[in-house]
Amino acid sequence: MKLIYIFSLVAVIAVTMIPGIMGEAEAEGRPPQIGIFDQIDKGMAAFMDLFKG
């Protein structure tokens, strides 16, 4: 039961926070930066650059 409560809380926080982050990023004309996802995106871009050309 506690796990369901924790997952529900995390889901509610994610649903309420992510649109705000996306809106701020759009207003400033930059890609959204959400902690670990931003780092993964940078890593994948660097990895793809290795095979470009």
Curated annotation (Swiss-Prot):
Predominant location: secreted
Pro-peptide region(s): 24-29
Keyword Signal: yes
Entry's transmembrane regions: none
Organism domain of life: Eukaryota
Expressed in which tissues: Expressed by the venom gland.
GO molecular function, one term: toxin activity
Sorted UniProt keywords: Amidation, Neurotoxin, Secreted, Signal, Toxin
Signal peptide: 1-23
Modified residues (Lysine amide): K52
The protein's role, per its UniProt record: In vivo, this neurotoxin paralyzes about 70% of blowflies (L.caesar) one hour after intrathoracic injection, when tested at high doses (45 nmol/g).
Protein name, UniProt field: U13-myrmicitoxin-Tb1a
Organism name: Tetramorium bicarinatum
